[in-house]
Structures are given as C-alpha cells and as structure tokens.
Amino acid sequence: MIGWLQGQKVEAWQQGTRQGVVLACAGVGYEVQIAPRHLSEMEHGQNTFILWIHQVQRDDGSSLFGFPERRERDMFRTLIGVSGVGPQMALALLEECQTGELVEAIVQGDLRKLCQAQGVGKRTAERLAVELRTKLAEFSCRDPGMSLVDNGVIDSHQLKDSSLHELQITLGGLGYEDLEIRRAIRAVASGAAIGASDMPESVPSIDDTDAWLRASLRWLSQEAA
C-alpha cells in the first residue's frame, strides 16, 4: 500500500471530469488523481511535490488519489466510509470545501453547502450529517490543524490567532462546548450575530477581544433561548 509519494510532476492529465498528474518517483511514473483546485496550485512554483496517497485496488487495476496534506487524505478516507459515497464524490466534496469548511458543514448539518458538491444529493448530504456528525465534532476538537483561521471560517484580518485562542479558552471556561464556541465565533465573524437592538452586529475590530467575547456570548444566549 502506498502512503505518500515525493517526486516531480511530469505532466497533468484529464479524462472526462477527472484530473491529475503523472508524478515521477525514482524512475517510475505514478498517475495520481487530485482535486482540480490542487492541480491549479501545482501549475505554479516548485516542480517537486509530496502527495499523501489513498490507493483503491480493483480487479482491473488500482487508482491513486493524492492530497497535499495528510488530514485531507484522512478526511477523504472518512468520507468514503459512508454508504453511497465513492472516491469521486468524496473528491468532489473536497473540491467544493476545504477540510475545515467541510467538517463544519457536516457537523452543523449544512445540507445546502454539502449539496453544492457535484453529484451530492439531499439524501447523501443527510447521510453524511447523520453518520459523521459526532465523529467529526470529536475530530475538530482533537486536531490542532483545524483552526478557525487556517480553514477559512474567519479571516486572519478579522482576529489575530492569539486573540482567537484566548477567546476560545475564555468561552470554554464558561462551560461552552467546542462546537458551540466555533459556531458562535463563525456567526460573529460573518456578521450573522444579532445585537441588543435586534439588528445585525458589525464585526468587531481585530484588536477588540472583549467585543468578540460579548458578541459571542450574545449569540450563544440567543441560541439557547
């Protein structure tokens, strides 16, 4: 079983909707399917790459799926463990969303977001949410790479990483669960939080951690009402 490959990109290929690269490793060329967004990233800069690999073995041969990050490969494996979700659908989900965004969508049951991926219907989206919600909620709590800033849930210009960590610690100390905290911060960052005057709040400034805390607490109290 191949775990990862390091080599030079010889060429890009496309067969219908499937895209990938031929990676030359120690004199052997491996044909690896990757998400289109990663293919465009590989068009620029260095020519040597490391891809984490998932290998699918069939009677008529094997297929390799490559990912620049291990956690994305692991997410792919989690997705294909769900009944009715094959490698192509899993890749489509990871093309539509970055890993952290996909975790958020599944945990929150955001069926509309999941259905934006090619080939994903409402029933499949519901199955993903039901079967993976608890598992991925635990995964997001454990994985230090699942930062709200790193996965694009909030912008680094909205809140410094150190301030974000302080905010999460403070809310956790008040008894809120990690998932509740992440949803609250996301709501405040997107401008979806409602202020005391029943009007949408403006996003607090990057340096005003207290304002972020107040807005998050208001959102959490409204959700609990």
From Swiss-Prot:
What's one GO MF term for it? ATP binding
What InterPro entries does the record tag this protein with? DNA_helicase_Holl-junc_RuvA_I, Hlx-hairpin-Hlx_DNA-bd_motif, NA-bd_OB-fold, RuvA, RuvA_2-like, RuvA_C
Assigned keywords, A-Z: Cytoplasm, DNA damage, DNA recombination, DNA repair, DNA-binding
- Where are the stretches annotated Domain I? 1-68
Pfam families for the chain: HHH_5, RuvA_C, RuvA_N
Region annotated Domain III, chain positions: 159-225
Q: Which family does it belong to?
A: Belongs to the RuvA family.
Q: What is the name attached to this protein's record?
A: Holliday junction branch migration complex subunit RuvA
| The organism of origin for this protein | Prochlorococcus marinus (strain MIT 9313)
